[in-house]
């Protein structure tokens, strides 16, 4: 799966690279996700986002237009993401709660979510989208 991670710090980059183990084609960018940096998501299927970047309706709409289908958050919460915009765009959203001291575990779970989406599966308990993919197969949405 082609993914992009914005606003990633050097240590997070290292953890993500180790967790990914070259399974997914992940573009890593240290800049924040803004309307000015949105174009880097062109041709990607998934976005990896952290606490620092707010996803408002305009960004979500832009991500959808560029081909993003999945948002994998590694955040303390998801209050920085416009959930109604995500639902309206039909994007899948998963969050792995970011815990200090458990960073490597968090990155492994983010990669596992990418694995599941690449296989057409729901991400289970990490799912934050309003879709009912836990009830019916993901391809029926």
Describe each model-derived feature in a short phrase.
Residues 1-44, 125-141:
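N-terminal glycine-/charge-rich "phosphate-binding" loop or analogous flexible N-terminal tail
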Residues 46-118:
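Phosphate/diphosphate ligand-binding glycine-rich loop within oxidoreductases
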Residues 122:
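Flexible, glycine-/basic-rich loop-and-beta segments that form/coincide
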